[in-house]
Amino acid sequence: EAASDNGFTVDIVGFNEELEKQKNRARNARSNEQSMNIQNEEYLNFKRKSEFVGYTTLEQESTVIGLFKDGKKVNKANGLLFVVLEKTPFYAEMGGQAGDQGIFTYKGQNFDVLDTFKLPNGQHAHSVDFKNQEISVDDIVLACVNTDYRLAVSQNHSATHLLNQALREVLGQHVVQHGSQVTKENLRFDFNHYQNLTVEEILKVEKIVLDAIKKGYEVKTIETSLENAKKLGAQALFGEKYGDVVRLVDM
């Protein structure tokens, strides 16, 4: 009725089709999460603590505290493994941002870290192809993050925040982030709006983002309480879990 009163028509069929697609995507996402968190008890039962140090260093010598192969916890193995370290500089996939890549140096050889993700209890797991080299729990590796990869991903992550602000300026404060995907190559930003953006609106958004990039704003990082972060204007992403202390990035 509101649309009709303002001279608009609503494509009910199209809306229902898109709604069903979104429901399917949500179901698939929940299914993938359940396969990690529920179906694999090996991951669920792994409780050893692992510390993330990747905000202060991108290189760390560390002890292997967990090994998984084909979903099973093992004491030693070769080939494609999920490796958990006592301390790691590798950022795990979270909030739509891709996990770090890089290398592990072990017994004088370099092995590719293909991806980094979180296990159910919060430890960062590294997907590493050790090929024919066997590695054991309690062995020591040198973990080195690919700095170019981290920089490219972090730049695209910063761009999502600039885009969020630009959209709110152009379209209105009703715009809320509903998700994102941030990789080395590009970014995707999901948000709500009443209709498709016009060419004029898109150009305005692009200009605001590009102008902000050209100004080269200083990026400041602080750790504060979740409550204080919200008072400072931080926007919590729906569906994300936050601790009592959060890392607040200001540009």
Regions found by a protein language model. Give the residues of each.
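A glycine- and charged-residue-rich anion-binding loop/surface
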Residues: 1-251
